[in-house]
Amino acid sequence: MIDLFYKAYSFWRRYGTRAAIKRIRAELGPKPQLAPAAYSAPVIAPSATPRSAAQLTKARFEALLPLALYLLPPSPHKRITVVTDSIARSSLFGGVGTALIFATLLANRMGADLRVITRTERPQADNVDHILSVYGLTLKGEMQFKFLPIHERNQSSDFTESELFITTSWWTTASTLGSVPASSILYLLQEDERMFYPFGDDRLRCEEILARRDISFLINTKLLFDHLVADGLTNIAEMGSYFEPAFPSRVFRPSSVDKEPGGKRKFIFYARPNNVRNLFYLGIEVIEAAIAHNVLDLNVWDIVFVGKDTPDIVFGNGYSPIKRENMSWSEYAALAGTIDLGLSLMYTPHPSYPPLDLAASGAVVVTNQFGIKQDLRRYSANLICARAERAALVEALRQGVALAINQPLRQKNFLGNGLCTDWEVSFSDTIERLAGRH
């Protein structure tokens, strides 16, 4: 029983209250038609009858079961398939959006159609249209969508042996590997996904996928690539390549609207309490201390929380931050252009997107160090890295405030950014290599 409660608690910590409620309803009531909105490690309830090892393992790792695909005869027509959990609005920021941009550019280069298979939520085509339009991209071929839910095995779809599958997580990779040749898979890896878990079965299975030598890898940033190789995944050096993400000025740029004379400056915090790697609780402690020490003067700064599932909170003598959630990509980009200073934490080696989004939009950003992620000035001199501890981050915010209000220096740093501004440039080498093979 203790183990059951621990699994339920772990599920809640990872996926949040909304997903936990859905899971509880699924366990206690009739099975819903749609699967939960995120890959889950199912809570295994006691059974009246003994189950085999295979049955228990299958129930525990249902998301790893092979995709329900059937093979079609060879066809001269080309298709690329992206396999991901969801393309809902809240899922598109960062990694999934990157996968769709990459797949679109590759499909256009290869003269291929593009299919998106989702596993946890029905695909919403309008969301793909929105992100492509924001970046000025148009798919030349046909766009297709298919929902193959994790928890339902009565739906299937087709594939051909020449089809290229772009997977977006270790679990979508594992599921796809059960149905198509390994040589057909390109795993778009955008985080050290082992760090999603404590040491246990999930982490072990994740590492087994990350260590495979029969699939190709595309890694988001050289920083993450170097970390993975240095941490024992030598197959990544042999079977993988990396890219640096792009931040086109048509999307991320300083706002053209001047601040009102005497108007308050904007401070943003990337607030995702249910994504533990974002160090939400350290972040709010840092903000509280920064206010107490007058680093963030509430007469000068508006505090904005951007994220998901953010609880109501007050700072200082009752100040409530502004909350912005469930924004579209264009709304998020527009907000980023109005920010002066940001705090965005990520307790992994990857720099993560929000600090880079903000730096590309002209803001100063404080983030934390982790492993080989010690300095991000290669991207922008407006990025300040500090140890992941309260005092160090408060001091970094003090430096950030000074830089944010020093408009000439801040602008000079912005103009000297080392961020790529063109996705076609970011992916050019990979796209040419793949186009030559497929």
Language-model features: where?
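Conserved catalytic-core segment of nucleotide-activated headgroup transferases in glycan assembly
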Residues: 95-98, 115, 225-323, 327-329
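Conserved active-site histidine-acidic residue motif and adjacent donor-binding/catalytic loop
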Residues: 148-153, 309, 320-336, 351
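Membrane-proximal helix-turn-helix segments that form the acceptor-binding/catalytic region
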Residues: 154-160, 200-218
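A short, active-site helix/loop in glycosyltransferases that binds the activated sugar's phosphate group
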Residues: 171, 175-176, 213-239
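Aromatic "clamp/platform" in nucleotide-sugar-dependent glycosyltransferases that forms part
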Residues: 346-347
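Short hydrophobic beta-strand element within catalytic cores of glycosyltransferases
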Residues: 364-368
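A charged, aromatic-enriched C-terminal amphipathic alpha-helix characteristic of glycosyltransferases
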Residues: 388, 402-438
